[in-house]
Each structure stands twice: as structure tokens, then as C-alpha cells.
Curated annotation (Swiss-Prot):
The Tat system comprises two distinct complexes: a TatABC complex, containing multiple copies of TatA, TatB and TatC subunits, and a separate TatA complex, containing only TatA subunits. Substrates initially bind to the TatABC complex, which probably triggers association of the separate TatA complex to form the active translocon. Pfam families: TatA_B_E. GO terms for biological process: protein transport by the Tat complex. The lineage of its organism: Bacteria, Pseudomonadati, Campylobacterota, Epsilonproteobacteria, Campylobacterales. Residues 48-79 are annotated as: Disordered. Residues 66-79 have a biased composition (Basic and acidic residues). This is Sec-independent protein translocase protein TatA. Keywords: Cell inner membrane, Cell membrane, Membrane, Protein transport, Translocation, Transmembrane, Transmembrane helix, Transport. The keyword Nucleotide-binding does not apply. GO terms for molecular function: protein transmembrane transporter activity. Part of the twin-arginine translocation (Tat) system that transports large folded proteins containing a characteristic twin-arginine motif in their signal peptide across membranes. TatA could form the protein-conducting channel of the Tat system. The gene is tatA.
Length: 79
């Protein structure tokens, strides 16, 4: 009684699928599923290649910001 080990379980499952989708629709569903998996694998591969080509570090300069003290701000607001 360990799940779907009997051939009759699989026959019933396949019969229900045929009844739900129809015999003509099943190949279309399988084709769509196959192309979806193929596109997913291609996208994963492209992302991995893109990650390999990206630089490891960024060569950028960080802008220094001036920190204003509260006394400087008050004097500027009063003038």
C-alpha cells in the first residue's frame, strides 16, 4: 500500500487525464510543457553565462558628501 505502485493506479490516473483534457489536447499540453522546460533551461544557462561575464569589482569613485553641523545650518537659515 505504498502509493502508486500498482499498474491499475496509473491506468486510472491516465484515464482521468484523458477524460479531463481529451485525447487531442494531451499532445498539445505535452508539447507546451516541453517547450516551457526548454525555455526555462535556456534562460538559466544564459543567466549563468551573463554572471560569469560580469566584472567582479566595480571601478567607480565614490563622491564625498559634506556633512553640515547644526550651527552651520542655523546660520545659513538666518541669513
Amino acid at each position: 500500500m505504498g502509493g502508486f505502485t500498482s499498474i491499475w493506479h496509473w491506468v486510472i490516473v491516465l484515464l482521468v487525464i484523458v477524460l479531463l483534457f481529451g485525447a487531442k489536447k494531451i499532445p498539445e499540453l505535452a508539447k507546451g510543457l516541453g517547450s516551457g522546460i526548454k525555455n526555462f533551461k535556456k534562460a538559466v544557462k544564459d543567466d549563468e553565462e551573463e554572471a560569469k561575464n560580469e566584472p567582479k569589482t566595480l571601478d567607480a569613485q565614490v563622491a564625498q558628501t559634506k556633512v553640515h553641523e547644526t550651527s552651520e545650518i542655523k546660520s545659513k537659515q538666518e541669513s
